[in-house]
Amino acid sequence: MRHFCLVTAAILAFVTGPATASAAQVVRVTSLSALQAAIDKAGPGDEIRLADGSYSAGSAIAIKRSGTANAPITITAEHVGKAEIKGSAGFSFSSGASHVVLRGFKLRHGGSMSVPVGSTHNRLTRLDVQLTGGGNWVTLNGDDTEFDHNVMQNRTTQGVFLQVLGPAKDMAKRVKVHHNYFSNHKFTGSNGGESIRFGLSHHQKYSAGGVVEYNLFEKADGDSEAISVKSSDNVVRYNTIRDSRGFIVLRHGDRSVVEGNILLGRSGIRFHGNDHKIVNNYVHTTANRGIVFGSGNEADSGPDSKLHDRPDRVVVAYNTVVGTTDGIHGDGGDFKPKDCVLANNILQGTGKLVSMPGGSDVKYEGNIAWGGPAGMPSGGYKAVDPKLVQDGLYRLSSGSPAVDAGVGSYPYAGTDFDLQTRSGKYDVGADELLPGGARKALTKADVGPLAP
């Protein structure tokens, strides 16, 4: 391990007096003690850089100071991924520490990291997180936290990579999680190894307004839920899940949107609760169900219930589901889906394309089913070859019967999975036949600390 004991002239000059916004400066440090001293004196606009190397922390590196919206405090590695924090502890935000950017560190320490209630508008970016302790690695409790361009990988123990919580009787608001790489969670237990968990059961009725987008998940095998949403009013969009046991799951809560995700290999989408929109997703899997209407153990969940709430008024529209053993499936339970819609989806596979339990209240319209038994009322689909062509993903060809075949009004599906705007009569499925703009599944080059 490399040790540092020198403090540069810049830091010696810095600590002689308090920093102000007008005197914002870059301060380079070469030890953890100097880093802590610089953080303790930091003011709006200051940037503190820790030199490349490996450092062992015997106690938490406390962040108590705040920047401003226009002049955040930045605490960063000199070069992304080149300053490693080992030992028994890492960075610790104090309640009230706000407008702070934590950037570029390689975190290999014990314990965990959290942004507490009362700490707002903080950003954790370009971190390489592979902690040595158990439990949940990173917890975000503060409003308006941004967690982006990080990598979290390689664990075999129970506990989630990232969870978003908040106060005991509310959720953290407007948390944004984007362009991260989650990989290789191999916990073999039955529960408790999610990559992302957005709330707990008792948060289900609280509105979070969170966004989870442009993240890549590979070998997310720690739980059947890679992204587990247990709060209300969230958006999960434009993510790629590849070769993973974990699904996108709306486990609790209402009024969330799952849009434009690309799910490859073993993953899919499952939902419980009310008034969700599941639109413009692409599911290509040979080993699992594509989209699942979750089981209902109760008609509507109470605020602290851990049972499965039946789906009510959920719209599943303009998705493409290909190559699945069971395309769209209803789990059953005592309480069946009620007032739900399955519209304008392309379903292609060799197994039963739709399999819903008796007593389900679902409106079917405009779907295209090909290759296996449709499993829908005859008026709810057309049994025609959608004439998909593959360029890495299956898309419409110019002669597809899906072109301009959408029925009904679903304006919230107006952006296809290529992020192109639909107009006129929409094309059935996740892809609108338009020139240019073909989107690819995310790769490691698109996410994580070294991505653009």
Predicted regions, residues:
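Positively charged n-region of N-terminal signal peptides that target proteins for export
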Residues: 1-4
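Bacterial N-terminal signal peptides
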Residues: 7-16
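Right-handed parallel beta-helix/beta-solenoid
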Residues: 12, 20-37, 52-54, 78-79, ...
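N-terminal extracellular ligand-recognition/capping segment immediately after the signal peptide
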Residues: 30-39, 44-73, 80-90, 111
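Acidic glycine-/aspartate-rich tracts in secreted/extracellular proteins
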Residues: 53-56, 79-81, 372, 406-410, ...
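Glycine- and acidic/polar-rich repeat regions and solenoidal domains
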Residues: 58-66, 78, 83-94, 108-123, ...
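Surface beta-loop-beta hairpin patches that serve as ligand-binding interfaces in beta-rich domains
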Residues: 363, 400-452
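Short catalytic/signature loops enriched in Gly
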Residues: 386-408
